[in-house]
Amino acid sequence: MRTSLHPNGLLIGGFIVSLLLLCCCNSELPSAPDPLGETTESSDVESIKMTPDQAIAYVRLFGEEITVASTPENKLRAADLDRQIGLVDYYVENNDTLLYAVNYKDEKGYVLLSSNNGGFPIIAHSDAGELRFSDIDKENPLWLVIMSEAERVKDQRENPDRANLDYYDDWKDIGNPDYQYEIEPTSEVPSSRLRAMRKHSTGKKTIYPYTGEKLSNWCQFGNFNTYAPNQAAIGCPALAVGMLLYDCHQRMLGKMEHVTVPRFPYYAERATKDNEDGKRVSMALRQIADSIPNYQWGAKPGDYSAAYAVDILEGLKKLGFRQAELHPYDFETLYQNMSYKEYIYGPKLSNVSRGVLIGAGHLRNPREGHIWFCDGYYEQSYTVTKKFLFIKIKSWTEYDDRLYMNWGWGPKGGNGWYSADDNVWTSIEGNPEVYLKYRPMIFTNLRYYTSPEYSQH
Protein backbone atom coordinates (compact mmCIF):
# COMPACT_ATOMS: atom_id res chain seq x y z
CA MET A 1 0.00 0.00 0.00
CA ARG A 2 1.46 3.38 -0.97
CA THR A 3 0.52 6.39 1.05
CA SER A 4 1.06 10.04 1.78
CA LEU A 5 -0.91 13.07 2.81
CA HIS A 6 -1.63 15.72 0.22
CA PRO A 7 -3.61 18.98 0.11
CA ASN A 8 -5.87 17.39 -2.50
CA GLY A 9 -6.88 14.56 -0.20
CA LEU A 10 -6.39 10.83 0.10
CA LEU A 11 -3.79 8.99 -1.94
CA ILE A 12 -5.34 5.78 -3.24
CA GLY A 13 -2.85 3.05 -4.02
CA GLY A 14 -3.04 -0.68 -4.66
CA PHE A 15 -2.15 -2.99 -1.80
CA ILE A 16 -2.71 -6.31 -0.11
CA VAL A 17 -4.44 -5.23 3.06
CA SER A 18 -4.06 -6.76 6.50
CA LEU A 19 -7.55 -7.90 7.41
CA LEU A 20 -7.22 -7.79 11.18
CA LEU A 21 -8.88 -4.85 12.90
CA LEU A 22 -6.58 -4.77 15.94
CA CYS A 23 -3.35 -6.42 17.05
CA CYS A 24 -3.22 -9.58 19.09
CA CYS A 25 -2.24 -8.73 22.66
CA ASN A 26 -1.20 -10.65 25.78
CA SER A 27 -1.03 -8.15 28.67
CA GLU A 28 -3.30 -8.68 31.64
CA LEU A 29 -6.14 -6.44 32.77
CA PRO A 30 -7.35 -5.76 36.30
CA SER A 31 -10.48 -7.53 37.43
CA ALA A 32 -13.61 -6.30 35.69
CA PRO A 33 -15.90 -3.98 37.64
CA ASP A 34 -19.56 -4.47 38.15
CA PRO A 35 -20.75 -4.18 34.54
CA LEU A 36 -23.69 -2.05 35.51
CA GLY A 37 -21.74 0.04 37.99
CA GLU A 38 -22.91 2.35 40.73
CA THR A 39 -25.24 4.88 39.22
CA THR A 40 -27.93 7.39 39.95
CA GLU A 41 -29.31 7.30 36.43
CA SER A 42 -32.98 6.83 35.70
CA SER A 43 -34.59 3.40 35.47
CA ASP A 44 -35.03 3.98 31.73
CA VAL A 45 -31.26 4.24 31.31
CA GLU A 46 -30.68 1.18 33.49
CA SER A 47 -33.19 -0.84 31.51
CA ILE A 48 -31.30 -0.59 28.22
CA LYS A 49 -27.92 -1.50 29.71
CA MET A 50 -26.57 -4.83 28.56
CA THR A 51 -25.18 -7.39 30.99
CA PRO A 52 -22.12 -9.55 30.24
CA ASP A 53 -24.39 -12.59 29.89
CA GLN A 54 -26.40 -10.76 27.25
CA ALA A 55 -23.24 -9.75 25.40
CA ILE A 56 -22.11 -13.37 25.31
CA ALA A 57 -25.56 -14.47 24.13
CA TYR A 58 -25.39 -12.01 21.23
CA VAL A 59 -21.96 -13.36 20.28
CA ARG A 60 -23.23 -16.92 20.32
CA LEU A 61 -26.20 -16.03 18.14
CA PHE A 62 -24.54 -13.63 15.71
CA GLY A 63 -20.85 -14.59 15.95
CA GLU A 64 -18.96 -14.78 12.68
CA GLU A 65 -18.18 -18.48 13.04
CA ILE A 66 -21.88 -19.40 12.82
CA THR A 67 -22.96 -20.56 9.37
CA VAL A 68 -26.34 -21.51 8.02
CA ALA A 69 -24.95 -24.83 6.83
CA SER A 70 -23.65 -25.76 10.28
CA THR A 71 -27.06 -26.22 11.91
CA PRO A 72 -30.05 -28.44 11.10
CA GLU A 73 -32.81 -26.97 8.96
CA ASN A 74 -30.81 -23.78 8.39
CA LYS A 75 -31.70 -22.53 11.87
CA LEU A 76 -29.44 -20.99 14.50
CA ARG A 77 -30.45 -21.70 18.10
CA ALA A 78 -28.87 -19.57 20.81
CA ALA A 79 -29.67 -22.15 23.48
CA ASP A 80 -27.98 -25.02 21.57
CA LEU A 81 -24.66 -23.42 20.61
CA ASP A 82 -21.57 -24.17 22.70
CA ARG A 83 -19.03 -21.58 21.52
CA GLN A 84 -15.66 -21.40 23.20
CA ILE A 85 -15.99 -17.98 24.78
CA GLY A 86 -12.87 -16.76 26.56
CA LEU A 87 -11.99 -13.44 28.16
CA VAL A 88 -14.69 -10.75 28.28
CA ASP A 89 -13.00 -7.35 28.46
CA TYR A 90 -14.70 -4.09 29.52
CA TYR A 91 -14.22 -0.47 28.55
CA VAL A 92 -15.29 1.54 31.61
CA GLU A 93 -15.64 5.24 32.37
CA ASN A 94 -16.82 6.52 35.76
CA ASN A 95 -17.63 2.97 36.84
CA ASP A 96 -20.00 2.60 33.87
CA THR A 97 -19.29 -0.15 31.32
CA LEU A 98 -19.63 1.35 27.84
CA LEU A 99 -18.19 -1.38 25.59
CA TYR A 100 -17.60 -5.12 25.73
CA ALA A 101 -14.94 -7.14 23.92
CA VAL A 102 -15.95 -10.81 23.92
CA ASN A 103 -12.95 -12.93 22.95
CA TYR A 104 -12.94 -16.50 21.71
CA LYS A 105 -10.46 -18.86 23.34
CA ASP A 106 -7.06 -19.54 21.75
CA GLU A 107 -7.06 -16.12 20.06
CA LYS A 108 -9.62 -17.23 17.48
CA GLY A 109 -11.19 -13.80 17.22
CA TYR A 110 -13.39 -11.42 19.14
CA VAL A 111 -16.58 -9.37 18.96
CA LEU A 112 -16.80 -5.69 19.98
CA LEU A 113 -20.20 -4.66 21.37
CA SER A 114 -21.94 -1.58 22.70
CA SER A 115 -23.35 -1.98 26.21
CA ASN A 116 -26.71 -0.53 25.16
CA ASN A 117 -29.47 -2.99 24.39
CA GLY A 118 -31.66 -0.36 22.73
CA GLY A 119 -30.33 -1.19 19.26
CA PHE A 120 -28.22 -3.79 17.48
CA PRO A 121 -25.08 -3.81 19.67
CA ILE A 122 -22.38 -5.54 17.60
CA ILE A 123 -19.89 -2.94 16.36
CA ALA A 124 -17.17 -5.10 14.78
CA HIS A 125 -15.66 -8.55 14.95
CA SER A 126 -12.61 -10.49 13.78
CA ASP A 127 -11.92 -14.16 13.10
CA ALA A 128 -8.41 -13.99 14.58
CA GLY A 129 -6.58 -12.36 17.46
CA GLU A 130 -7.71 -11.05 20.82
CA LEU A 131 -8.93 -7.60 21.89
CA ARG A 132 -8.02 -5.97 25.20
CA PHE A 133 -8.78 -2.29 25.51
CA SER A 134 -5.70 -1.53 27.61
CA ASP A 135 -3.40 -2.81 24.85
CA ILE A 136 -4.63 -0.45 22.13
CA ASP A 137 -2.11 2.25 21.27
CA LYS A 138 -3.73 5.63 21.90
CA GLU A 139 -2.00 6.91 18.74
CA ASN A 140 -3.68 4.23 16.65
CA PRO A 141 -6.61 5.68 14.64
CA LEU A 142 -8.66 2.70 15.77
CA TRP A 143 -8.60 4.11 19.27
CA LEU A 144 -10.51 7.08 17.87
CA VAL A 145 -13.12 4.69 16.51
CA ILE A 146 -13.52 3.08 19.92
CA MET A 147 -13.74 6.49 21.58
CA SER A 148 -16.41 7.48 19.08
CA GLU A 149 -18.46 4.39 19.92
CA ALA A 150 -18.03 5.07 23.64
CA GLU A 151 -19.29 8.63 23.14
CA ARG A 152 -22.32 7.27 21.30
CA VAL A 153 -23.12 4.98 24.23
CA LYS A 154 -22.80 7.88 26.69
CA ASP A 155 -25.10 9.99 24.52
CA GLN A 156 -27.69 7.22 24.62
CA ARG A 157 -27.30 7.06 28.39
CA GLU A 158 -27.96 10.80 28.65
CA ASN A 159 -30.87 10.65 26.18
CA PRO A 160 -32.70 7.35 26.85
CA ASP A 161 -35.68 8.57 24.84
CA ARG A 162 -33.57 7.97 21.71
CA ALA A 163 -33.37 4.24 22.39
CA ASN A 164 -35.28 1.92 20.09
CA LEU A 165 -37.73 0.59 22.65
CA ASP A 166 -39.33 -1.82 20.18
CA TYR A 167 -35.93 -3.38 19.57
CA TYR A 168 -35.26 -3.51 23.30
CA ASP A 169 -38.61 -5.18 23.98
CA ASP A 170 -37.89 -7.85 21.36
CA TRP A 171 -34.35 -8.62 22.51
CA LYS A 172 -34.33 -7.81 26.25
CA ASP A 173 -34.54 -11.50 27.22
CA ILE A 174 -31.51 -12.67 25.26
CA GLY A 175 -29.17 -14.38 27.71
CA ASN A 176 -32.04 -15.52 29.94
CA PRO A 177 -31.94 -19.35 29.96
CA ASP A 178 -35.74 -19.53 29.97
CA TYR A 179 -35.89 -17.79 26.58
CA GLN A 180 -34.71 -19.03 23.19
CA TYR A 181 -34.14 -17.07 19.98
CA GLU A 182 -34.15 -18.70 16.53
CA ILE A 183 -33.15 -17.12 13.21
CA GLU A 184 -34.21 -18.37 9.79
CA PRO A 185 -33.17 -16.65 6.52
CA THR A 186 -36.01 -15.61 4.22
CA SER A 187 -34.06 -13.88 1.41
CA GLU A 188 -33.48 -15.56 -1.94
CA VAL A 189 -29.74 -14.89 -1.79
CA PRO A 190 -28.12 -17.24 0.76
CA SER A 191 -26.35 -15.76 3.73
CA SER A 192 -23.85 -17.53 5.97
CA ARG A 193 -23.71 -14.82 8.62
CA LEU A 194 -26.86 -13.31 10.03
CA ARG A 195 -27.42 -9.91 11.62
CA ALA A 196 -29.90 -7.10 11.07
CA MET A 197 -30.13 -3.34 11.28
CA ARG A 198 -33.85 -2.58 10.94
CA LYS A 199 -37.34 -4.06 11.05
CA HIS A 200 -38.70 -2.70 7.79
CA SER A 201 -37.99 -3.42 4.15
CA THR A 202 -36.81 -0.57 1.93
CA GLY A 203 -38.32 -2.23 -1.12
CA LYS A 204 -35.12 -1.71 -3.11
CA LYS A 205 -34.71 -3.97 -6.13
CA THR A 206 -31.97 -6.58 -6.13
CA ILE A 207 -29.00 -5.75 -8.38
CA TYR A 208 -27.27 -8.91 -9.54
CA PRO A 209 -23.48 -8.56 -9.81
CA TYR A 210 -22.12 -8.93 -13.32
CA THR A 211 -18.69 -7.40 -13.89
CA GLY A 212 -17.67 -7.91 -10.26
CA GLU A 213 -18.05 -11.66 -10.74
CA LYS A 214 -16.84 -11.83 -14.36
CA LEU A 215 -13.54 -10.11 -13.53
CA SER A 216 -12.81 -12.03 -10.34
CA ASN A 217 -9.30 -12.88 -11.60
CA TRP A 218 -8.19 -9.28 -12.09
CA CYS A 219 -5.41 -8.27 -9.72
CA GLN A 220 -2.06 -6.48 -9.51
CA PHE A 221 0.16 -9.50 -10.10
CA GLY A 222 1.84 -11.24 -13.02
CA ASN A 223 0.76 -10.32 -16.53
CA PHE A 224 -1.62 -7.59 -15.38
CA ASN A 225 1.53 -5.56 -14.64
CA THR A 226 3.17 -6.16 -18.04
CA TYR A 227 2.95 -2.54 -19.20
CA ALA A 228 3.63 -0.87 -15.85
CA PRO A 229 6.96 1.04 -15.72
CA ASN A 230 9.75 -0.32 -13.53
CA GLN A 231 7.98 -3.71 -13.34
CA ALA A 232 5.81 -2.13 -10.66
CA ALA A 233 2.20 -3.06 -9.92
CA ILE A 234 -0.32 -1.54 -12.32
CA GLY A 235 -2.18 0.13 -9.41
CA CYS A 236 -5.72 -0.18 -8.08
CA PRO A 237 -6.85 3.14 -9.67
CA ALA A 238 -6.23 1.77 -13.17
CA LEU A 239 -7.67 -1.63 -12.24
CA ALA A 240 -10.90 -0.25 -10.73
CA VAL A 241 -11.52 2.20 -13.59
CA GLY A 242 -10.84 -0.67 -16.01
CA MET A 243 -13.61 -2.68 -14.37
CA LEU A 244 -15.93 0.30 -14.71
CA LEU A 245 -15.21 0.64 -18.44
CA TYR A 246 -15.73 -3.09 -18.97
CA ASP A 247 -19.02 -2.75 -17.09
CA CYS A 248 -20.14 0.08 -19.38
CA HIS A 249 -19.38 -1.96 -22.49
CA GLN A 250 -20.42 -5.48 -21.50
CA ARG A 251 -22.94 -5.38 -18.62
CA MET A 252 -26.17 -7.23 -19.21
CA LEU A 253 -29.26 -5.38 -17.88
CA GLY A 254 -27.32 -2.15 -18.23
CA LYS A 255 -26.98 0.59 -20.79
CA MET A 256 -24.25 -0.94 -22.96
CA GLU A 257 -21.96 1.86 -24.13
CA HIS A 258 -19.60 1.81 -27.12
CA VAL A 259 -16.31 1.99 -25.24
CA THR A 260 -13.23 2.35 -27.43
CA VAL A 261 -10.69 4.23 -25.28
CA PRO A 262 -9.47 1.90 -24.05
CA ARG A 263 -11.27 -1.12 -25.46
CA PHE A 264 -12.16 -4.09 -23.25
CA PRO A 265 -13.43 -6.91 -25.51
CA TYR A 266 -15.11 -10.06 -24.21
CA TYR A 267 -11.76 -11.80 -23.67
CA ALA A 268 -11.07 -9.50 -20.72
CA GLU A 269 -13.13 -11.77 -18.50
CA ARG A 270 -10.75 -14.64 -19.31
CA ALA A 271 -7.69 -12.65 -18.27
CA THR A 272 -5.55 -14.01 -15.45
CA LYS A 273 -2.15 -13.08 -14.09
CA ASP A 274 -0.66 -16.02 -16.02
CA ASN A 275 -2.21 -15.91 -19.52
CA GLU A 276 -1.86 -13.78 -22.66
CA ASP A 277 -5.24 -12.15 -22.10
CA GLY A 278 -3.81 -10.72 -18.90
CA LYS A 279 -1.12 -8.99 -20.97
CA ARG A 280 -3.73 -7.52 -23.33
CA VAL A 281 -5.70 -6.19 -20.37
CA SER A 282 -2.49 -4.71 -18.95
CA MET A 283 -2.08 -2.61 -22.11
CA ALA A 284 -5.56 -1.13 -21.61
CA LEU A 285 -4.90 -0.55 -17.91
CA ARG A 286 -1.74 1.37 -18.83
CA GLN A 287 -3.86 3.63 -21.07
CA ILE A 288 -6.14 4.32 -18.12
CA ALA A 289 -3.21 5.12 -15.84
CA ASP A 290 -1.83 7.52 -18.46
CA SER A 291 -5.20 9.32 -18.43
CA ILE A 292 -5.01 9.95 -14.68
CA PRO A 293 -2.91 13.04 -13.88
CA ASN A 294 0.07 12.63 -11.56
CA TYR A 295 -0.17 8.83 -11.55
CA GLN A 296 2.55 7.64 -9.20
CA TRP A 297 4.28 4.52 -10.51
CA GLY A 298 6.12 2.23 -8.14
CA ALA A 299 9.88 2.80 -8.27
CA LYS A 300 10.93 -0.85 -8.49
CA PRO A 301 9.55 -4.33 -9.25
CA GLY A 302 6.59 -5.16 -7.06
CA ASP A 303 6.08 -1.63 -5.74
CA TYR A 304 2.48 -0.45 -5.70
CA SER A 305 1.33 2.43 -7.87
CA ALA A 306 -1.09 5.10 -6.71
CA ALA A 307 -3.10 8.24 -7.46
CA TYR A 308 -4.96 10.90 -5.51
CA ALA A 309 -8.76 10.80 -5.49
CA VAL A 310 -9.06 14.18 -7.22
CA ASP A 311 -6.71 13.01 -9.97
CA ILE A 312 -8.72 9.82 -10.44
CA LEU A 313 -11.80 12.02 -10.81
CA GLU A 314 -10.04 14.04 -13.52
CA GLY A 315 -9.00 10.83 -15.25
CA LEU A 316 -12.59 9.58 -15.25
CA LYS A 317 -13.67 12.77 -17.00
CA LYS A 318 -10.97 12.35 -19.64
CA LEU A 319 -12.10 8.77 -20.23
CA GLY A 320 -15.71 9.79 -20.93
CA PHE A 321 -17.39 10.18 -17.53
CA ARG A 322 -17.63 13.95 -17.92
CA GLN A 323 -20.19 14.46 -15.16
CA ALA A 324 -18.35 12.35 -12.58
CA GLU A 325 -18.26 13.73 -9.03
CA LEU A 326 -16.74 12.70 -5.71
CA HIS A 327 -18.92 12.49 -2.58
CA PRO A 328 -18.71 11.05 0.95
CA TYR A 329 -20.00 7.48 1.15
CA ASP A 330 -23.71 7.26 1.76
CA PHE A 331 -25.67 4.08 1.10
CA GLU A 332 -28.67 5.82 -0.46
CA THR A 333 -26.40 7.75 -2.85
CA LEU A 334 -24.57 4.54 -3.68
CA TYR A 335 -27.76 2.67 -4.52
CA GLN A 336 -29.14 5.52 -6.64
CA ASN A 337 -25.96 5.43 -8.70
CA MET A 338 -26.13 1.65 -9.11
CA SER A 339 -29.80 1.37 -10.08
CA TYR A 340 -31.74 3.87 -12.17
CA LYS A 341 -34.01 4.23 -15.20
CA GLU A 342 -32.76 4.88 -18.72
CA TYR A 343 -34.12 4.99 -22.26
CA ILE A 344 -32.75 1.86 -23.92
CA TYR A 345 -35.27 0.87 -26.59
CA GLY A 346 -37.89 3.36 -27.69
CA PRO A 347 -39.67 5.94 -25.51
CA LYS A 348 -40.16 3.72 -22.45
CA LEU A 349 -37.84 3.98 -19.44
CA SER A 350 -36.15 0.74 -18.41
CA ASN A 351 -34.57 -0.31 -15.12
CA VAL A 352 -30.82 -0.54 -15.64
CA SER A 353 -27.76 -0.86 -13.41
CA ARG A 354 -24.09 0.08 -13.46
CA GLY A 355 -21.24 -0.58 -11.08
CA VAL A 356 -19.73 2.19 -8.97
CA LEU A 357 -16.29 3.02 -7.61
CA ILE A 358 -15.65 3.36 -3.87
CA GLY A 359 -12.50 4.69 -2.24
CA ALA A 360 -11.45 4.84 1.41
CA GLY A 361 -8.58 4.95 3.85
CA HIS A 362 -7.64 2.08 6.12
CA LEU A 363 -8.80 2.36 9.74
CA ARG A 364 -5.43 1.18 11.06
CA ASN A 365 -3.57 3.75 8.97
CA PRO A 366 -5.76 6.45 7.37
CA ARG A 367 -2.78 7.57 5.27
CA GLU A 368 -3.22 4.38 3.25
CA GLY A 369 -5.98 4.09 0.67
CA HIS A 370 -7.64 1.86 -1.90
CA ILE A 371 -10.25 2.10 -4.66
CA TRP A 372 -12.47 -0.80 -5.73
CA PHE A 373 -15.52 -1.81 -7.77
CA CYS A 374 -19.04 -2.52 -6.43
CA ASP A 375 -21.92 -3.73 -8.62
CA GLY A 376 -24.35 -5.90 -6.64
CA TYR A 377 -27.04 -5.34 -4.00
CA TYR A 378 -29.70 -7.31 -2.18
CA GLU A 379 -31.70 -6.89 0.98
CA GLN A 380 -31.14 -9.74 3.43
CA SER A 381 -34.18 -10.59 5.49
CA TYR A 382 -34.74 -13.22 8.12
CA THR A 383 -37.39 -14.21 10.59
CA VAL A 384 -36.66 -14.15 14.32
CA THR A 385 -38.74 -16.35 16.62
CA LYS A 386 -38.74 -15.72 20.36
CA LYS A 387 -39.77 -18.55 22.67
CA PHE A 388 -40.38 -18.87 26.40
CA LEU A 389 -39.70 -22.38 27.73
CA PHE A 390 -39.66 -23.52 24.08
CA ILE A 391 -43.15 -22.14 23.41
CA LYS A 392 -43.37 -19.50 20.67
CA ILE A 393 -44.43 -16.12 22.03
CA LYS A 394 -43.44 -13.76 19.20
CA SER A 395 -42.04 -13.68 15.66
CA TRP A 396 -40.82 -10.81 13.47
CA THR A 397 -38.70 -10.05 10.40
CA GLU A 398 -35.46 -8.05 10.33
CA TYR A 399 -33.48 -6.66 7.38
CA ASP A 400 -29.95 -5.68 6.36
CA ASP A 401 -28.36 -4.34 3.15
CA ARG A 402 -25.65 -6.32 1.31
CA LEU A 403 -23.22 -5.16 -1.40
CA TYR A 404 -21.07 -7.15 -3.83
CA MET A 405 -17.44 -5.98 -3.83
CA ASN A 406 -14.58 -6.76 -6.21
CA TRP A 407 -11.45 -5.54 -4.43
CA GLY A 408 -9.07 -6.16 -7.33
CA TRP A 409 -7.04 -8.63 -5.26
CA GLY A 410 -7.71 -11.70 -7.40
CA PRO A 411 -9.88 -14.83 -7.01
CA LYS A 412 -8.81 -15.47 -3.41
CA GLY A 413 -8.79 -11.82 -2.38
CA GLY A 414 -12.19 -11.62 -0.71
CA ASN A 415 -14.51 -10.74 -3.63
CA GLY A 416 -18.11 -11.28 -2.56
CA TRP A 417 -21.01 -10.00 -0.44
CA TYR A 418 -20.49 -7.54 2.43
CA SER A 419 -22.78 -5.74 4.85
CA ALA A 420 -23.35 -2.13 3.78
CA ASP A 421 -24.04 -0.78 7.26
CA ASP A 422 -21.19 -1.88 9.53
CA ASN A 423 -18.27 0.22 10.71
CA VAL A 424 -16.07 -2.09 8.64
CA TRP A 425 -16.88 -4.11 5.50
CA THR A 426 -18.22 -7.31 7.07
CA SER A 427 -18.22 -10.36 4.80
CA ILE A 428 -21.25 -12.63 4.96
CA GLU A 429 -19.47 -15.44 3.07
CA GLY A 430 -16.68 -16.23 5.50
CA ASN A 431 -14.08 -13.81 4.11
CA PRO A 432 -12.09 -11.73 6.60
CA GLU A 433 -13.43 -8.27 7.32
CA VAL A 434 -11.99 -5.36 5.34
CA TYR A 435 -11.19 -2.21 7.31
CA LEU A 436 -11.29 0.30 4.46
CA LYS A 437 -13.86 2.52 6.16
CA TYR A 438 -11.86 5.66 6.99
CA ARG A 439 -13.64 8.58 5.29
CA PRO A 440 -15.11 6.41 2.51
CA MET A 441 -16.18 8.16 -0.68
CA ILE A 442 -18.09 7.37 -3.86
CA PHE A 443 -17.44 8.41 -7.44
CA THR A 444 -20.94 9.34 -8.63
CA ASN A 445 -22.70 10.14 -11.94
CA LEU A 446 -20.88 7.29 -13.69
CA ARG A 447 -24.13 6.52 -15.51
CA TYR A 448 -23.29 9.39 -17.88
CA TYR A 449 -20.73 8.33 -20.47
CA THR A 450 -19.56 9.91 -23.72
CA SER A 451 -16.82 8.31 -25.79
CA PRO A 452 -13.64 10.43 -25.58
CA GLU A 453 -12.93 12.61 -28.59
CA TYR A 454 -9.19 11.93 -28.65
CA SER A 455 -7.79 8.95 -30.51
CA GLN A 456 -6.61 5.74 -28.91
CA HIS A 457 -2.87 5.65 -28.18
Regions found by a protein language model. Give the residues of each.
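Structured segments of extracytoplasmic/periplasmic soluble domains
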Residues: 61-65, 116, 239-251, 318-319
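Bacterial Sec-dependent N-terminal signal peptides
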Residues: 1-5, 19-45
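Sec-dependent N-terminal signal peptides
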Residues: 7-17
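Surface-exposed intrinsically disordered loops and tails
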Residues: 223-227, 266-273, 341-344, 383-397, ...
